[in-house]
Amino acid sequence: VICQFFDILAEELNAKIVLASGNEGNLKMAVHKTFVADDTTLRSFIEGDEHSVEGDNKAYIRYGQMDFYGNDTKAFKIQAVICNTERNTIIKRFEVPMTEEANNGVWQYWCSSNFKQYDTDILDTSFDKYFSGYVGMSWTVDSVSMRRYATIDVYVIDNPETNANHKYRLGFEIVGEDGQRVDGYAATYTATFDNNGIAGWDDGTADGSVSDMATAMGTLCVGSYS
């Protein structure tokens, strides 16, 4: 993770690295939750923005990587999901199980037909119907803290014919244990977290959005937005 890189660099340079935070503004690029006995689920939608594609055409795109950190050595369940927002129903789930050690560091991608590049890519009919692009997942264990963290990598464009009203949205769902905490960070301008006003989904926040880069021993962090 990036905090380890900063520690190594600061030691080699015999210097302190100053991180200026604050450029996140009010973008909801972070999400945090401490689970309690009667609420062990964190779910949020991955949102993006309109971008130019193929000349003057515009498309609603979410892209980039999101990292989700546990606060201890325990595994947590994380899935990327497709939700029918009109019915508030998850219609598809994607997962690289964190409970199976053979999956440590393994990437798995699901994609639409026009984005399939590798033999290991899985062409998913539901994803292909409503989106163009891909969603990838992986997890590993931090070698210093021994905390587990997962990454979701997306490039997703809503299908202009079957999903023109953004009825079907991509999100994620995390299930943990009582007392466990998970912190997630998105790619700011290209991906944020939102509940879209739908019951049972968690909203993103700008709080804590400087990410784990500020936790390095050789850094000083100034100017946090919140």
Regions found by a protein language model. Name each.
Residues 1-226:
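Loop-rich non-cytosolic ectodomains and luminal regions
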